[in-house]
């Protein structure tokens, strides 16, 4: 019976250590965590928390030249978070839309103007 108790305690200790190693702050550490139709964003303020945000829809605000970034964040509680494929402030537009340089909004692409930003520019 003493061996059984020791095994249980060891199992619980392993679970606690495993859970502590998987700590994550916010919704995401990569856009892949957010699923289709969303991306991982981090705000502009110090100690912002990563969150999943919907991709820009027609007429939504967007940021021209906002490529995905890899960031290493440190928080006052000692937690460090590595973000990959994440965006500052807002997600890019949906794939069928483009961020207009003139209006900074998601619009349908138009071949006749140079005012559109192709979202696929930063994709592999």
Swiss-Prot record:
Subcellular location: Secreted
Disulfide-linked positions: 28-40, 34-52, 39-91, 62-99, 93-106
Pfam family, one: Prokineticin
Residues in the signal sequence: 1-21
Superkingdom of this protein's organism: Eukaryota
GO cellular component, one term: extracellular region
Keyword 4Fe-4S part of the UniProt annotation: no
Keyword field contains Metal-binding: no
Function comment: Cytokine directly involved in hematopoiesis.
UniProt family annotation: Belongs to the AVIT (prokineticin) family.
Name of the protein in its database record: Astakine
Organism of derivation: Penaeus monodon (Giant tiger prawn)
